């Protein structure tokens, strides 16, 4: 028990070192303590939290927690340099790119410190971060990035898990250590100058106004592009991706307008703090750490238009060791998203995203609240989600992949998620992801194609060892959808202590060792409440549902076997089990409570 008390004390006391007698006002935020541990999982979490938050001074026993090393925190000199000293003008008209560059260069050359952005409207081109610099936005500071695409040079970088050429990100850093962006100001990425827009995502007035602003329409007149060059590039196959025949930046000059940058891009950086600010109107992904270690993201708000294509809030790609807490996301694509490279390139890189804690985060509009995939070819593991809230997302917990991705996703722990008004699935495991919106647009379908088993290979993805408990959802299209591949079942999923209100209940296909315990499913459609197809070793323990359901459980598929129902009042349904096509007669056993 002394170790637990020490873990709690460390978790309560630890916080990143910030400037201003070493602190800038408003930049610090205390970490909530842990006070009790009633299960082995909570014991693991205590060690995780202590390790993540304690830093280099943690006792050796905690630092040695398997696969959960401590997060190393940032530390800065108290010296503060204002961008005003370097000629910046807050009139919303003067381009302050050089002033930001000079201030950041002077700060890093002096050994580091704080670059202060005072209150005001600051127009600028891209800002390139440097070692040992904390870029701090005062309350009321608005950094407006230029809408002139010519202000952003092309660079070699990464796009959706592949080596590619893109425009330089508005906020950019590579191969840095000990960096921060803090404060209570706002960054605006001028995303409307970059993004295509689908007609189906706007009302008539909005669409007419957008078309009248200029740009170009595709042949079907259902997608708007900011320029003719952007439209032309949209018809090409992976126009920004580096290939054997296109290896130089100049090879991509004719499609520059199409190559949207991610808004905040950090590559191969160590000891990163992002805290307190608002970041909005991104051209593409909003916050994208790639191959970064030791990341703390605290109290950050990301806001993008709901129609914004690819405007994920946070994409952690092949990153290790961090905490994301008290953040608020309201965007046009995924909310919190875990990635690790795409297909062969991701597998060759072989760096999973691992050892992260996500807690007390809120996601409003997004394709998914907490998401893994689909670009997860390097794998993901040891991720903890605690006490998060999703309101109005398309999917709540969204785990997506597809054939060809490869990668292993494992050891995912979720404890405490509340959801309302989920348009699609509250909990989704899907190996049929096809880069479509999770909620079909008019004329689209999300039904999986008929697929036969294929030989296993390095491109076969794997989902296994997920532990989900204490989840509530008030309103969804489907409570739980588990959809594996014929050649690779989704395995070892535990869902416990959940109350899920949805139109449909459970759909489980191509899965193995799935366990539901103390789960209430309040579905409008009750024929059936639970549907299992080609799945094995399914445990349904103390399942509650609305009285008078037509069919509690339907099973089908010749590979279905060992479905066990226990501690469940099967008499509340008009029919307890319905055997569908090709289902073995002894596939289901019911233990009366």
Predicted regions and their residues:
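Bacterial N-terminal signal peptides
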Residues: 45-57
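Extracellular cell-wall/glycan-interacting regions and their flexible linkers
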Residues: 14, 38, 564
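N-terminal polybasic/positive-inside topogenic patches
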Residues: 2-3, 8-22, 26-35
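Extracellular/periplasmic carbohydrate-active domains that bind, remodel
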Residues: 62-593
């Amino acid at each position: 028990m002394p170790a637990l008390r020490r873990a709690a004390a460390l978790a309560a006391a630890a916080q990143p070192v910030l400037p201003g007698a070493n602190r800038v006002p408003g930049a610090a935020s205390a970490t909530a303590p842990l006070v009790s541990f009633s299960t082995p999982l909570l014991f693991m979490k205590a060690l995780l939290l202590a390790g993540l938050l304690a830093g280099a001074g943690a006792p050796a026993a905690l630092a040695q927690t398997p696969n959960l090393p401590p997060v190393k925190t940032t530390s800065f000199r108290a010296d503060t340099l204002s961008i005003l000293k370097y000629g910046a003008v807050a009139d919303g008209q003067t381009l302050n790119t050089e002033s930001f560059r000079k201030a950041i260069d002077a700060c890093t050359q002096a050994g580091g410190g704080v670059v202060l952005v005072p209150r005001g409207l600051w127009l600028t081109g891209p800002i390139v971060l440097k070692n040992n610099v904390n870029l701090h936005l005062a309350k009321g500071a608005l950094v407006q990035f230029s809408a002139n695409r010519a202000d952003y040079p092309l660079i070699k970088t990464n796009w959706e898990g592949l080596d590619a050429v893109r425009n330089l990100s508005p906020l950019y850093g590579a191969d840095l250590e000990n960096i921060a962006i803090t404060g209570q100001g706002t960054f605006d990425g001028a995303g409307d100058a970059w993004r295509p827009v689908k007609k189906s995502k706007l009302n008539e007035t909005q669409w007419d106004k957008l078309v009248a602003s200029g740009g170009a329409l595709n042949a079907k007149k259902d997608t708007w592009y900011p320029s003719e060059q952007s439209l032309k590039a949209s018809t090409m196959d992976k126009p920004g991706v580096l290939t054997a025949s296109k290896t130089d930046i100049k090879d991509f000059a004719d499609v520059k307008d199409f190559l949207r940058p991610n808004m905040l891009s950090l590559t191969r950086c160590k000891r990163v703090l992002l805290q307190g600010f608002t970041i909005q109107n991104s051209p593409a992904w909003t916050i994208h750490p790639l191959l970064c270690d030791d990341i703390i993201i605290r109290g950050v708000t990301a806001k993008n238009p709901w129609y914004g294509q690819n405007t994920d809030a946070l994409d952690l790609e092949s990153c290790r060791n961090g905490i994301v807490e008290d953040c608020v996301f309201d965007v046009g694509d995924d909310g919190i998203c875990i990635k690790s490279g795409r297909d062969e390139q991701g597998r060759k890189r072989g760096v999973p995203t691992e050892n992260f804690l996500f807690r007390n985060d809120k996601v409003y509009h997004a394709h998914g609240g907490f998401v893994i995939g689909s670009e997860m070819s390097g794998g993901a593991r040891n991720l903890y989600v605690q006490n998060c809230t999703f309101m109005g997302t398309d999917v709540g917990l969204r785990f997506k992949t597809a054939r060809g991705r490869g990668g292993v996703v494992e050891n995912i722990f979720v404890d405490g998620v509340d959801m309302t008004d989920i348009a699609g699935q509250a909990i989704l495991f899907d190996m049929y992801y096809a880069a479509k919106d999770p909620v079909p647009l008019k004329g689209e379908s999300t039904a999986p194609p008929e697929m036969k088993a294929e030989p296993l290979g390095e491109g076969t993805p794997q989902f296994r060892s997920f532990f989900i408990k204490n989840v509530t959802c008030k309103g969804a299209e489907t409570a739980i959808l588990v959809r594996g591949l014929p050649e690779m079942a989704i395995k070892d999923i535990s869902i416990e202590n959940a109350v899920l209100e949805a139109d449909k209940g459970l759909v489980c296909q191509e899965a193995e060792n799935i366990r539901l315990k103390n789960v209430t499913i309040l579905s409008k459609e009750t024929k059936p409440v639970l549907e299992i197809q080609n799945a094995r070793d399914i445990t349904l323990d103390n399942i509650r549902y609305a009285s008078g359901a037509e069919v509690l459980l339907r099973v089908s598929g010749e590979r279905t076997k060992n479905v066990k129902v226990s501690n469940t009042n099967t008499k509340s349904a008009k029919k307890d089990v319905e055997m569908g096509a090709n289902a073995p007669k002894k596939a289901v056993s019911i233990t009366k409570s």
